[in-house]
Amino acid sequence: MRETADGVLVVSHDDSLLRMCGEDRLISEMTYEEIKQYPIINGRNASQYPDNLIPTLEQYIACCNKYSVTPVIEIKSIRTEEAMNLFMQLLTESQKEPVLICFRIETLGKLREMGFTGKMQWIRTVRMNASMIQQCKKYDLDISAEYKNISMNDINNAHQNGIRISVWLCRNEDMVDIFRKMGADYITYEKWNTDEVKMRYYSHSTIPRGVWHEYAKIPRHTSQNSIAAGNLE
């Protein structure tokens, strides 16, 4: 979710329209009326929806309400106080309490100060540490961790401190199964073409070595290729 130049909150992962709409301009420097001039042209089946536009956050929440879905909203950029107030107001329109995620602890802390009491996740791309745990306890946050930077010990430590763990960028079902058994509370599955990326537990390229050895409870010098997948159950 990002703020446009005229204070509209829109749903876009990227900061520009280049990848999805073919226009190399920053969302933060465009009004929403300008953004609507560029329909989405990339993505699966995009050609079947020629008038598909970058949606507003209000439209996204309305869609979630229609299908009784819990909104999960990553906050990319809120630049102004007015936009933050608008964001808080839009959250109240959701029939199910939204889950908010963000890389910036300052933004999450501000939302707590403004009265948001729902679930929030601090997105991290580094290993968990004591300072991170304390920050999460201060603002009642969970942690959203990149798969290669989380271990079973980290998950156990977080749980002991009342913190849930979300793991993202899992690339196949084997990785999902590993982190599920390690105790992850939420898992984001990046489902690719399984015929091309199908791998088992002994794949060198998919599962981080430390995570794999910890899960399998074997010495860290052991080769992944030396143990059959069935022996990891």
List each language-model region with its residue ranges.
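Metal-dependent phosphodiesterase/phospholipase catalytic core, i.e.
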Residues: 8, 13-117, 139, 161, ...
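A glycine-centered beta-loop-beta connector
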Residues: 3-9, 179
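Active-site beta-loop-alpha junctions enriched in small/polar residues
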Residues: 2-4, 14-15, 76-78, 103-106, ...
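C-terminal active-site rim and adjoining tail of enzyme catalytic domains
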Residues: 47-51, 121-233
